[in-house]
Amino acid sequence: MKKLLTVLLLGVLFLSCGKNEGEKTPKENGKTEKTVTEIKETLGASTAPLKWLVQKIAGDNYNVIAIVPPNANHELFEPKPDDLKKLENSKLFFTYNLLGFEKKISESLNNSDKIVNVLSDADPALLLKGHHHHHEDEKEEHGHHKDKDKHDDHDKHDEDGEIDPHVWFSLKLMPTAALEIKNKLVQAYPDKKDVFEKNYNAFLDELAKVKEDINKKMASKTKKAYMIYHPALNYFIKDYNVEEVAVEYEGKEPTAQQIKEIIDEAKEHKITTILVQPQFPKQSIEIIAKEVPNAKIVEFNVDKEDVFENLKQFVDYLD
């Protein structure tokens, strides 16, 4: 009887220990998973489109952050101390070095070695200049003209002759930026070279496919013209001979006289696609749309992360 009782007690103790260990396992697993998440290296990018490109090359094992918040105006954005703190904790900071806030951040970071200008090796011929128009002729002065190669970028930091900063819409500059990102990542994480090379090549394949799809769609367009409040697509429309009518002038709302001229120009080019942007006011656009036959107002966010999807959506908007 004593023997039997001893065996039963040992059995209970064994089961009890087993249960306790079993309860700890999920917790331990939880700690392990949390630790893996916490050790993800952080990489910084100036804008959401650049974050998208860095993530494409780096892969999902890296935490890529964009400094400009969603739907914020990247041209008026001012970095805060918290933004700089985030970048101080990041391994690298990828930038186009064209927007005003990018330059401020680069000058403020303690470690300049982490700054990567993704267009440092870009062909200067592919970079477009921003222009401000100061003409005596009122018709030209409002800044809504037909020249496809001369669109205002109206960056508040730009002066005559400076570079149009909306380079993420250039399909020709993307390979240069992607290569620079890949090379800097390889330098920082040489043991991951194969991963970066694979991701880089996959991106180039995807880029080729996107260009092919866009070329086919653009070839079928009957009207290559549109209106936008703040011009930002110069790099893209230049390659496809698309007419643009911009609404703002020198970063300001158009006057009543300028609105009348914009309406006349829209009618002349039979424009029906009018883009509004979450970063800018819509009042002028809505007034103009009421006077333009068959006008359709659609939202277009120039700072949307996925540049490929953004450009494909823009092409679909055109008639």
Language model features: what each stretch is:
Residues 17-319:
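Extracytoplasmic metal-acquisition and chelation regions
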